[in-house]
Amino acid sequence: MKYLVTAQEMKQYDKNTIEYLGIPGPVLMERAALAAEDFIKERFDAVKERTKVLIFAGMGNNGGDGLALARLLAADGYAVAVKCVGDMQRATKQWKSQWQTLQHFPVKTDSNIAVDEYNVIVDALFGVGLSRPVEGNYADAVKEMNKAEGFKLALDVPSGICSDTGRVLGCAFLADATVTFGFCKRGLVLYPGAEYAGEVRTANVGIGQESFLGQEPEMYTYEKGSVQLIKRNAAGNKGTFGKALLVAGSTGMAGAAILAAKAAYRTGAGMVKVITAEENRQIIQQGIPEALYGSCRQLTESLDWADVIAIGPGIGREEQALQCLKTVVERSRKPLVLDADALNLLAEESGRMLAEELRAQGAEGRVILLTPHVGEMSRLLKRTTAECKDDLPTCAKILAERFHAVAVAKDARTVVCKEQGACYLNTTGNSGMATAGSGDVLTGVILGLLAQGMDAPEAATCGVYLHGMAGDLAAGLHTEYGVMAGDIAECLMKNQNKKA
């Protein structure tokens, strides 16, 4: 597991490290500068004589990190210059101390620095906690850095990026790489911040889990190889690995059902039954002969058969779809995944009573998972898509709390939130997965994991991770331009063992 922190969390951990663990602030600053120096030396030591580093330093402790970096690089034989931005009279205490020390080293600090003479540009203007648009001299500095040629490195967070949401505040430094300190910041993983951060390295500067003091970060992600799948029972049979019921596919939308059913099987479900429009029967049986078939008239009896249920992919919003949703909600209390049109129906006036019933069931303990994309989430929460996209973690948390459910908020960086506890931010996947049917595959993946006995939060987080991994494998075969949802389904679990 890899923690992703907010600015407020990071500042608290920094404070805990200094006040409770007894590690002085200047020591943390020195270790941050050493980490940044190591990063630069890895890339440029072989061409040190031809490397000239220009550091843009603000007046806060991020700027202090930049001054300390300048000193270390100069002591190691690099040509270094510092361009200060802001009022030195308002600089922090640590900044002023670093500035005084820097005067004893061969670092150019005058105001007439020609940026085009330098081939490594370092952004040390703001760091974490920026909450308002970059303006004035700071905006000019960001634009000047962006226009410069050469390698661009940000310290902690690219200036102009909100460290909590990844939003651009006015203008932002476009880095080739970012060395972030202590823990990775959310805004370096969420878009568009991830694009501005470039390659991200999280450096250990002495702020570790000991600094939590019982208050862990509220978001995490998986590191490669850390996903644990359920161990298969060597003596098991098809019933052992779960009976998954999938309500999907109105007339002409059989593809959604086929994709989801294939994904459930590929993920390990023992049996999958598809409830779909009668007109889809032949297509379903040809497209996925392994699946059982049932018409909508057989839904009630199929609920008794199933261990877990998913409804929504391609069902449409007509009366028959609403009646199927009504049956699933009212006549079963089994674990339920709701996707696509099932969510759209809940957001409409015709589905209002069903939404209230679902909330009541969630409060009573029914396992419920909601898997909206940003548009569906906006309809469920009665917010604009822009509002949801700008702060997906908060919106996902609200949805989880409202339905007493697990919310899987799908976007370029999918967020999984449960009613209580930390949220998961997914980092697998690529732009090729923004294609019709991709969400249907994810529904099937989560359904398949639930069928095997995974608890809901784990099935959601693991499912999103595996779905993204399959998308990455598919892009490796077809490029991001050529990925289709069927490719994602076919790549599920390839090259995977018990650990993914």
Regions inferred by a protein language model and the residue ranges of each:
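N-terminal small/polar loop signature for handling phosphorylated ligands or for N-terminal nucleophile
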Residues: 68-146, 282-294, 300-301
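Short beta-alpha junction loops
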Residues: 86-89, 158-159, 342
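Generic preference for hydrophobic/aromatic residues in regular secondary structure cores
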Residues: 108-109, 173, 416
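Internal gly/pro-rich beta-alpha loop/helix module
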Residues: 119-120, 125-217
